[in-house]
């Protein structure tokens, strides 16, 4: 039986602790807050969109050739659904999004808490790990003592405890008010790991385009495309939301994964909005040709609504666009300069983190044997729609099982 410490009481940490304890180990879960799962309660607007039936390798930043994808092929959406059902939580699917049947995040919190209680996991709250050191022979009071454990964990209150294995599942930097301050990155660096620069993603994109003030509060189905220094990055379709000096909506959140870093590097970033993605430019041109003279304004208002119509017509006038080809181009290629993104205070996820090339398919460090990682502390980010939470659950389970069995 090994003595295993899991640092971080979120979904990844809970699954890691449960899995490791299921293998017959003594497991201690360390959580800096007064209780675990604070951030979990916010997911899916409080409904906990825990997974997505449309899991694909391109939904994440690592792609299909990375060993992590093989893990997700095994521990897929169906696996997680069955896992929860076996533990007593029914689920349901809306489109491809998966939720607990109760549509309440606290249902998942209660389930995870009961799972940890069942496996007698020792949950220690209000405890922050500030240092982890791998002990080698001669470093334990002058003599190596296997019974003392291979890792020394120092805490903010001055206490130091020894463990055989460590699983770091501290999350990233998103929602720092809930304890996500990047502490896990410091611990990883201390143990020899590279940590890439971090950026807030799945967040709003900011703009200083004053013309957009007229459409604040408007929502419109559209296709949005990111452009960085003249090169197209990615496209998404969905509901585009115009906020005060910002663009929002799931389609924008997904694009922020590709734009946050270039924004920080002062690249020229543009969002190109296609207000009629269901029609090609040629089809739209032909349609516009059939509209009688003097009726174009009516077409815009009926099709796009009063505020959006006014925005488009102003753009057409400002750029002196008069023929149907030019008008069609504006509708299909409305360009918005992006000047920034929201901070980690508003972002859902962190881009960047512990270098995943230094972690194997069992989520064990290639640098420090006995050290494992799970969840958002790793340089893994996925799309909106349950992808990131699924990775937290799956990576936590895999890390816990790997740590628990390798004794």
Feature roles, as predicted:
Residues 165-211:
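Glycine-rich loop(s) and the adjacent beta-strand/alpha-helix scaffold that form part
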Residues 125-148:
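A conserved short coil-to-beta-strand element within the FAD-binding core of flavoproteins
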Residues 22-23, 35, 56, 73, ...:
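Residue-level recognition of phosphate/Mg2+-coordinating polar/acidic sites
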Residues 41-109:
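A conserved beta-strand/loop capping segment in the N-terminal third of enzymes
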Residues 5, 21-45:
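Glycine-rich FAD pyrophosphate-binding loop
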Residues 5-7, 30, 129, 160-176, ...:
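Short hydrophobic core segments
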Residues 174-187, 191, 379-407:
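A conserved FAD-binding loop/helix module that cradles the flavin
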Residues 1-12:
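Beta1/beta-strand and adjacent pyrophosphate-binding region of the FAD-binding site
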């Amino acid at each position: 039986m090994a003595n295993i410490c899991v640092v971080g009481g979120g979904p990844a940490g809970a699954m890691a602790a449960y899995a490791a304890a299921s293998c017959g180990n003594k497991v201690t879960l360390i959580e800096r807050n007064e209780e675990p799962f604070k951030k979990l309660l916010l997911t899916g607007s409080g409904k906990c969109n825990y997974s997505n039936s449309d899991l694909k390798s391109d939904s994440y930043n690592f792609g299909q050739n990375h060993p992590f994808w093989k893990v997700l092929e095994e521990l897929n959406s169906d696996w997680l659904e069955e896992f929860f059902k076996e533990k007593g939580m029914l689920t349901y699917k809306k489109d491809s999004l998966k939720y607990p049947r109760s549509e309440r995040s606290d249902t998942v919190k209660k389930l995870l808490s009961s799972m940890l209680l069942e496996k007698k996991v020792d949950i220690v709250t209000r405890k922050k790990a500030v240092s982890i050191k791998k002990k080698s022979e001669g470093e334990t009071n002058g003599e190596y003592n296997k019974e003392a454990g291979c890792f020394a964990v120092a805490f903010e209150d001055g206490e130091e405890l020894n463990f055989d294995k460590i699983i770091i599942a501290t999350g990233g930097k998103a929602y720092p008010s809930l304890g996500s301050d990047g502490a896990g990155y410091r611990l990883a660096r201390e143990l020899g790991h590279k940590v890439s620069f971090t950026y807030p993603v799945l967040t709003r994109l900011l703009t200083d385009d004053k013309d957009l003030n007229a459409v604040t509060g408007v929502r419109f189905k559209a296709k949005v495309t990111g452009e960085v220094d003249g090169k197209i990055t990615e496209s998404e379709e969905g509901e585009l939301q115009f906020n005060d000096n910002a663009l929002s909506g799931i389609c924008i959140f997904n694009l922020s994964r590709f734009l946050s870093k270039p924004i920080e590097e002062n690249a020229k970033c543009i969002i190109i909005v296609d207000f009629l993605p269901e029609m090609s430019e040629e089809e739209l041109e032909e349609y516009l040709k059939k509209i009688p003279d003097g009726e174009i304004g009516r077409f815009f208002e009926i099709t796009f609504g009063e505020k959006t119509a006014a925005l488009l017509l102003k753009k057409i006038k400002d750029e002196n666009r008069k023929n149907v080809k030019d008008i069609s181009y504006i509708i299909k290629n409305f360009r918005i300069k992006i000047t920034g993104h929201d901070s980690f205070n508003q972002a859902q996820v962190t881009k960047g983190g512990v270098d995943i090339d230094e972690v194997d398919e069992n989520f064990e460090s290639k640098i420090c044997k006995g050290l494992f990682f799970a969840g958002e502390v790793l340089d893994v980010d996925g799309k909106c729609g349950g992808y990131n939470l699924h990775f937290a659950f799956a990576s936590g389970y895999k890390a816990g099982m790997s740590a628990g069995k390798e004794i």
